[in-house]
């Protein structure tokens, strides 16, 4: 007998192919143009080589995420896995570093909106577009407005179309002239050597954010325990190969002297390569699609981090005013304004600096997931009940250790300034732990990362099913 009060159950309709496609679209192929100029300058035009290294490193990490999903077949995150494997303090610090990522993600979207719109309307400064985007997202967040899901689907569809046309134009340009083109050269280390390629690959970690989003579909998968781990690995591989293809095609067709370009030219390189290959109309189409997508991503990131700050304020881990809700709309207005004030840094930071900071947090979280596999499977709490098999040792010991080593290698390839900011942020996290635990005498409270990096649909559902509770200002 069905009761009207029972919540509707999600239909288990997604197989391996559907889950993989979700993961690839969540990563967004057009992301390759976010750091197109930055990484090409760092690697002296060897972006495909950097992507290849990044894909190899990410496949090991994806395998670790897949292993953790098998153990915890629910939507999880690096914070969840670290907290379960190593306890509250390690989990909190991992979550704290992830929070740094969440704070910078809206910022980089605002910056890109300003940079790209300025290429079409050069009379208006970059900072004006950036500030307007920031204020609009803040307003929408306070009012509780989110983008319609159909618009997100349209942006994804247009992005895929754009990339397909771009690759076709790039190959036509590369092979349509009389100049001989080297197919292999973009995959070599170049004069900068493996160090430059590693630095580029470290920045590209931000291209893979969200590859684990497949884990949120556990209730909609036909065979979640089997298919979701596979889909995580397949979506990482497929998305990575698409990144390599796009960067390779662009590198064959457009080879400027990257070291001689100005900072502004480097940041807007994605627009420049579109203009060279497709002309003004194609470039305008690219900018329109990219800006709308960046605006949606900025909104999603803003809502996500505002709710995390709200929860931390509510639980006493951060100042209580962060838990204040707007009287009329019930949204975390103080937290939203705090995120926007932080995002004002976009007016004077470089795109490269922000990209490095996002990669710092991402790589730190990835490293902890790799360690969590080793701890969970080889050294479980309460001890092992049976001997370790060779297969288990290779899958849950050697593979995640390689993933950890590769991640740390890329992590150490980031700029020194990035490490300084990251170290200060971690130190603040340790101080917070000391305060909320009364000098490490009480257990470390859990952070509310239940939503991870939610999609717009998830945010809509969150607002309907789990309205925020708290003091209304």
Region spans (language model):
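Membrane-helix boundary/coupling elements in multi-pass transport proteins
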Residues: 74, 97-110, 203, 208, ...
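C-terminal membrane-solvent junction of multi-pass transporters and transport-like membrane proteins
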Residues: 17, 151, 321-330, 366-419, ...
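Membrane-interface "cap" regions at the ends of multi-pass membrane proteins
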Residues: 1-37, 41-46, 58-63, 75, ...
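Membrane-interface loop-to-helix entry segments
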Residues: 114, 126-180, 232-237, 355-368, ...
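TM-loop-TM module centered on a large, flexible mid-protein loop between adjacent transmembrane helices
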Residues: 80-81, 87, 118-119, 231-299, ...
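Helix-loop-helix junctions that connect adjacent transmembrane segments
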Residues: 5-10, 44-48, 52, 125, ...
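Extracellular loop-to-transmembrane helix junctions
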Residues: 11, 24, 32-129, 238, ...
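A generic transmembrane alpha-helix motif of multi-pass inner-membrane proteins
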Residues: 361-362, 394-473
